[in-house]
């Protein structure tokens, strides 16, 4: 699979299923393969079969959750990720996915602890850190948000959205000079960043 030979992988997984019909793992492996080639409904069917065989198979819940995210069925995704968590899965990707799904469901306050945990488990995950910063800003925790945006731009100096959101956060704190500095950095990186250009015009009409 890692080499991109999906046909060979499919043959191997089919053989493994035939030889171990009561083992959930080959079903999960085949579902992961189907998911990676965008066969989403079939992938879900194989995750379901795996969970029939082993209701504590955390990776099946996680895989199904990812399929639901692709299908933009966020409530179902949230349910699956929560089941993966209850089944003992503890990794940064799971916490990140659960956090982002809660953001999609407009529950940023509930997303906060999951995104925080994602960052704790993987400090180099700039996207988890950025989403954590966004949630903090939404909840009015502006200094904490700025600290996360600063860490994001340190890790990824080309992250225009982090500079933009830092600029907006400084504007809320009525620090005009710092707000403009951050917005200018966002525009330097991405000259057509419409939100940053608009925010700059609001703060500095000249």
UniProtKB/Swiss-Prot annotation:
Keywords from the named record: Repeat, TPR repeat
TPR repeats (start-end): 1-23, 24-57, 59-91, 93-125, 127-159, 160-193
UniProt signal peptide: none
Listed PROSITE patterns: TPR, TPR_REGION
InterPro entries: TPR-like_helical_dom_sf (IPR011990), TPR_rpt (IPR019734), Ycf3 (IPR050498)
Superkingdom to which the source organism belongs: Bacteria
Transmembrane region(s): none
General function of this protein: Could be an interacting mediator in the complex formation among RNA sulfuration components, RNA processing components, and aminoacyl-tRNA synthetases.
Subunit architecture: Monomer.
Protein name, UniProt field: TPR repeat-containing protein YrrB
Source species of the chain: Bacillus subtilis (strain 168)
């Amino acid at each position: 699979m890692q080499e991109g030979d999906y046909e060979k992988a499919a043959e191997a997984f089919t053989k493994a299923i035939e030889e171990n019909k009561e083992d959930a793992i080959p079903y999960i492996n085949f579902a992961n393969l189907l998911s990676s080639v965008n066969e989403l409904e079939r992938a879900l069917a194989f995750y379901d079969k795996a969970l029939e065989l082993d209701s504590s198979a955390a990776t099946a819940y996680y895989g199904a959750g990812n399929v639901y995210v692709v299908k933009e069925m966020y409530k179902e995704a949230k349910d699956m990720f929560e089941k993966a968590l209850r089944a003992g899965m503890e990794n940064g990707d799971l916490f990140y996915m659960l956090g982002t799904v809660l953001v999609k469901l407009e529950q940023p306050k509930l997303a906060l602890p999951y995104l925080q945990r994602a960052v704790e488990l993987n400090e180099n995950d700039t996207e988890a850190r950025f989403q954590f910063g966004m949630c903090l800003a939404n909840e009015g925790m502006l200094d904490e948000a700025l600290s996360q945006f600063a860490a994001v731009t340190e890790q990824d100096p080309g992250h225009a959205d982090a500079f933009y959101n830092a600029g907006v956060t400084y504007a809320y704190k009525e620090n005009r000079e710092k707000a403009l500095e951050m917005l200018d950095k966002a525009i330097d990186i991405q000259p057509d960043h419409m939100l940053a250009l608009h925010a700059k015009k609001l703060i500095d009409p000249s």
